[in-house]
Amino acid sequence: MTLNLRGILKENKMITWDEQTDVVVIGSGVAGCSAAIEARSAGASVIVFEKMKITGGNTRISDGGLAAPGNRLQKEHEIEDSPELFYQDILKAGLNLNHRSLARVFAEQGAEAVEWLQVELGVQYMDRLDRFGGHSVARCLTTSSHSGKDIVKAQTSRLKEMGVEIRTQCLLTNLLTDDNGNVCGVQIKTGYNHKDQGAKEQKNIRADRTVILATGGFGNDVPFRMLQNPNLDTTVTSTNQRGATAEGLSAALKIGAVPVHLSWIQTGPWGCVDEVGYGSGSRFASYALYPNGILVDPSTGRRIVNEWADRRQRSMAIFKAGHPCVGIMDAQGAGHDSQSLEKCLKTGKVYEFNKLADLATACKIPSDTLASTVEAYNNMIRKGQTDQFGKSLKTAQLISSPPFFAMHLWPKVHYTPGGVGINTDAQVIDVRNQPIPNLYAAGEVCGGIHGADRLGSCALTECIVFGRIAGRNAAAKRGGE
């Protein structure tokens, strides 16, 4: 089979299709796998291509957190929540730059997505709820292993049962279009090795119905992210897996997809100085330190931010200080993630002290000032006051029970809220806000849902919501005829 391609292959050469399927999915993280499961369930033949040697992308190395209003645990604990409250939290964190129709779909379908993962795929959650910065209530679930590996295993196992092949080490180089601008396939380099950028051969795969782009973000693509924000150079590390680069996004932009919010790049304020990427240190800071402790500038001994603020506000406060800051908590607060604490103590990511004065000395913090800071903070908690940063301390954790714990924090690039524009059907749109026929996208490769910044535990949930939408609509060839 041959087809005259426009604007992608040089000199409009007639090409030979090496293979064909109904739906091509690029990326094997939670967004891509959710899309593939739905497309196959709808009767389409599906092939998933993954550029790395292992499946899962950032999902695999995530902490397995999923935010959803009205989830089962909230009902059991009589926590009042709603899609509307979630929606408002999303807009606030996103500085109201969110594409509201997309944020609304996400907020309204989040609980269903989390339920689908458990009921249909067997993913289990811990018997705990967390309230991370920017969320109005505790609505964040975590997988039983405290890892996204549970999700990857469940989804890839289901795809195997369904007869869907995931081909690793296959790099997307081009999205192929016909003379009418309809996406009709992909160009893939097989045998791709991320370490040396090598590949064996190039293949053209025809998609008889649609292509779904689920290639994730570009947090580890330093040259590309510096084009968007020159401040995020090599001195700012990333929590992402090595394959979090911009090839998929670039391929879509090349055929006319509209870029949305590319310069808004999220940094995680819980970045642990004493580890590479996102490990037990960052996890401990996220799940225990920020919810139950304080963040102090070591040069002054004073707090610098509302520890429950969204990620952008906390990161900006640390960047403003100009050096790593110190997170401090007591034994009771640290107990909220005892599993991570044990790992962090063994690996030197968290330090333990019997006295607050010893902590101050070790972390080079003015001891008297730190003592005053902690005393003032505890007094406001006892009185149920709101502090100078707007943090309501009625339910905050006292810092009074030894031993005390400290860790050094500096933001790391964690998430890229910007990407290709999509509509509520997960169709990729062009600069005229019109769908590019036969091209869908889901997950971090998309922009607009989160606006300027994303709330914690929202990435996986959002990937499931729009991955499922993309898969169902792609299989039906919705909007592509």
Predicted regions located by residue number:
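Extreme N-terminal leader/targeting segments of oxidoreductases
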Residues: 1-23, 41, 449, 453, ...
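Conserved N-terminal/central alpha/beta ligand/cofactor-binding core
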Residues: 3-6, 10-13, 45, 51-165, ...
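C-terminal structured subdomain/cap of oxidoreductase catalytic cores
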Residues: 17-18, 204, 337, 342-344, ...
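N-terminal Rossmann-like FAD-binding beta1-loop-alpha1 element of flavoenzymes
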Residues: 23-48
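Hydrophobic, small-residue-rich alpha-helical packing segments that form membrane-like cores
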Residues: 148-157, 173-202, 210, 219
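A glycine-rich dinucleotide-binding beta-alpha-beta segment and adjacent secondary-structure elements
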Residues: 174, 369-453
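Glycine-rich loop(s) and the adjacent beta-strand/alpha-helix scaffold that form part
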Residues: 193-194, 198-202, 206-274, 466-469, ...
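An anion/pyrophosphate-binding glycine-rich loop and adjacent beta-alpha core
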Residues: 249-369
